[in-house]
Amino acid sequence: MLLKRLSGLGYEWSVGNKTGKKIMTTRFELRARYIEGWYELDADKLISSTSHDFVFDDPAEPEPVNRKSLPEYMIRWDKRTRLLGATNVWDLSDEVRQDSDGILTDWEWWELAGTDLCGMAIVKTRDDGVFFERITYFDRLSNSS
């Protein structure tokens, strides 16, 4: 189960009800759902994890993506990356997490398996959802001499 896997990545868990089931705090749960939405290319799951003022900043896009335009962006992203040979399998590493003043901030290095596509991402989540993501791209070819 993905949530079980995510707990090993530093997702905060707290004891819930008397049965001892573990539940995540709201912003951690919404962040986990957001990740699932991307892994599964599930627009409904993705939208349900974002706040009303959500902004996604991808330098490959002419303007920032908002909550309303996120499903169309996800389709463009999938088409773009499949042209590069991707199958939507992600490798995330060098993850750093900070939970401060009600905002969960995640930084991570991302790589899209089967491609040279990689970069950094910062994602910010409140208890009403993911409200900001910015990605950058790293190009090994242009940095080699």
Residue ranges and their predicted role:
Residues 40-57:
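Short, well-ordered alpha-helical segments enriched in acidic and aromatic residues
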Residues 25-28:
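Amphipathic alpha-helical repeat elements characteristic of tetratricopeptide repeat
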Residues 32-36:
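Amphipathic alpha-helical repeat scaffolds
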Residues 20, 55-65, 80:
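A short gly/proline-enriched turn/hairpin at secondary-structure junctions
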Residues 2, 6, 11-13, 20, ...:
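A beta-strand edge to alpha-helix "cap/lid" segment located at domain peripheries
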